[in-house]
Amino acid sequence: VINESIAKLVKYGENAGLVSGLDKIYATNRILEVMQISDYEEPEQIPETPDLEETLNELLDDAAKRGLLEHNSVVYRDLFDTKLMDCLMPRPGEVVKKFEELYAKSPQEATDYFYKLSQDSNYIRRYRIAKDIRWSVPSAYGDIDISINLSKPEKDPKAIAAAKLAKQSGYPKCLLCKENVGYAGRVNHPARQNHRIIPLTINQTEWGFQYSPYVYYNEHCIVFNFQHNPMKIERATFVKLFDFIKLFPHYFIGSNADLPIVGGSILSHDHYQGGHYTFAMAKAPIERHFTIKGYEDVETGIVKWPLSVIRIRHKDEKRLIDLAEHILNCWRGYTDEDAFVFAETDGEPHNTITPIARKVGDTFELDLALRNNITTDECPLGVYHPHAQYHHIKKENIGLIEVMGLAILPARLKDELEELSKCLVEGKDVRAVAELEKHADWVDEFLPRHPELNSENVMDILKEEVGKVFVGVLEDAGVYKCTEEGRSAFAKFMETL
């Protein structure tokens, strides 16, 4: 039986174009080595299109039975099956060569090849991504995307305990470093033998291009500095974003802000995120135009969006880089006490920007979301951050992806919403259920709006209401609210430019 599983994995590699006929025996022997099997007989017959997840599970179960896994749990299974996938992988240099050959024909052909490879290699686990729950909700700002992320596996208690005991290794320095390519992983760091990177030169420095293993949206890519330098928003950031867009005009690219609370989860390594997807924010129109002295040729305006976003457009990206630097410098030093905007308190800076670049037709576009990370006694997690009334759905930072209109909600919500829907249909008291109690005030608020609620439509209603909460979260993160007062304070800043 195990011979059949091994042959199926090699057949999968052939079908995916990872392994050619010439590589078949080599790949088989590599798998035998990883499986610690010395005897092999080619099976008579195997399926034409073996399923990868099923085949790996057969191999993993066998390895676990024979004591090759420290524990038979997801962390150790992932470390082991990545070692198996490595047996099918082309060398990093071959991948880069193929990418460059295709790029000479068209950038999109090159990214198509690389994206497919990143999935075929199981670096992106398609069968896990398929578990993510996604929907979209209409709002005053356009259709907002919501997702409950289930593709990051929950660690089991044994792995968590082992990770605590494991000595802290400084290699690779972090999950983004180029040293991850081919790294075997450990209990507190994923295996990356099946991971490949394309080197790029942007702003005359060496950067790497890869896909995110968790694919929050189509062709979700990460562009990262080959040096482990911290995140920084500055003129060079805008240069690098546009250098990337000139290389891959079919992609957008953006950067997280460089301050805690309003930044992303990794501030220690300079990186950007991009992809082949049109977010609600990119579709949102300019609601009010402005002319900025010295930049009369640049189309400038405030975007109709819950966060405070300035959009600038021009056919020459150098004009946008100059203006973006001007806006960034003005915003970093800007205080307006009436609007509760403070550039700094006690020497700690608060103002920064989340920038997003794209090309529309022959015009370059740069969206600058104004961010401020001030905290107060009433809002210890941040004034322009999800407020406490929404924490039952989302309390994490609002980073780049959320700024653009895609909610990435915690996995716990899947079970909580299912439980909640049962309670609502049966008319039970939500407050009486320990893990649902946190949702009770929210339920009290929206239930009166839905007399039509029944077992057929309850989940749709919950999804719609979660969407409204996320819009509220984005409004919380906006420095200038979408009210007459907020918009006139925003205009006041625009006039200072």
Question: Predicted regions span which residues?
Answer:
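Hydrophobic faces of well-ordered beta-strands that scaffold small-molecule active sites
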Residues: 209, 253, 270-272
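Active-site microenvironments that recognize anionic phosphate/pyrophosphate groups
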Residues: 1-223, 227-230, 304-306, 320-324, ...
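Histidine-centered divalent-metal-coordination microenvironment in nucleic-acid enzymes
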Residues: 218-225, 263-279, 367
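Helical scaffold of the NTase/Pol beta-like nucleotidyltransferase catalytic core
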Residues: 194-196, 228-253
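Beta-rich nucleic-acid/ligand-interaction surfaces
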Residues: 260-268, 346-352
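Catalytic or ion-translocation cores adjacent to nucleophile or general acid/base/metal-coordination motifs
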Residues: 236, 245-265, 274-326, 332-335
